């Protein structure tokens, strides 16, 4: 099995993980379509903020593999072919807290099984640049994940959580997650 990308010191490195079959080049063609959903907020004021790490990760993946995003129903969408697989990459335009509608629409439209999705999201509970991959699990207080879980009626879908740390004063969580990366953090999360 190929490995899942992991974030480390400003680049993607590879880390084996049994949950996802996305990078397994030996899978049957029938299972070769995947939906990657990066969570974030639309608008220039939110670009490259901690809360938009899902958008940034997808941007890097799509650019690296020669794709481009186009505005479509409920999202910016790109289709990337890589290692014999099709990746539908989705950046919802519904704002973070309403991401479930776009997720469900595109999963149904593209006929992608829930197990062949991956939601990429920021996580305050993880140190900056650390990642966690789970096949299922709670929303951990993340409003984008809450909406997806409510829309799908389950929390049993794969999530890739990128740590953004929690270095903020009491009552400053919103400013922190919607804030731009500090210079020292930027070095850790610079996606290439």
Segment roles from a protein language model:
Residues 13-18:
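Short hydrophobic alpha-helical segments enriched in small aliphatic residues
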Residues 170-172, 179-192:
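A charged, well-structured terminal subsegment
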Residues 22, 28, 32-136, 146, ...:
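Nucleotide and nucleotide-moiety/phosphate-recognizing core
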Residues 4, 8-11:
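Targeting/processing segments of secretory and organellar proteins
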Residues 141-144:
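Hydrophobic alpha-helical segments within soluble ligand-binding/sensing domains
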Residues 132-138, 177-181:
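Short glycine-enriched, charge-decorated loop/helix-capping segments at active-site entrances
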């Amino acid at each position: 099995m190929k490995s899942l990308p992991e974030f480390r010191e400003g680049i993607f490195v590879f880390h084996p993980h049994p949950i996802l079959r996305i990078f397994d080049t030996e899978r049957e063609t029938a299972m070769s379509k995947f939906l990657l959903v990066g969570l974030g907020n639309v608008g220039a004021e939110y670009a490259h903020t901690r809360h938009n790490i899902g958008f940034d990760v997808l941007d890097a993946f799509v650019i690296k593999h020669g794709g481009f995003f186009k505005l479509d129903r409920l999202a910016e969408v790109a289709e990337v072919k890589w290692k014999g697989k099709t990746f539908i990459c989705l950046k919802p335009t519904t704002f973070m807290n309403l991401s479930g509608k776009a997720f469900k629409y595109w999963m149904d439209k593209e006929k992608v099984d829930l197990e062949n999705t991956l939601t990429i999201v920021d996580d305050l509970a993880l140190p900056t640049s650390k990642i966690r991959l789970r096949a299922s699990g709670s929303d951990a207080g993340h409003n984008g994940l809450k909406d997806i879980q409510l829309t799908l009626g389950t929390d049993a879908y794969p999530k890739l959580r990128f740590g953004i740390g929690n270095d903020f004063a009491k009552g400053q969580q919103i400013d922190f997650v919607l804030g731009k990366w500090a210079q020292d953090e930027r070095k850790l999360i610079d996606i290439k």
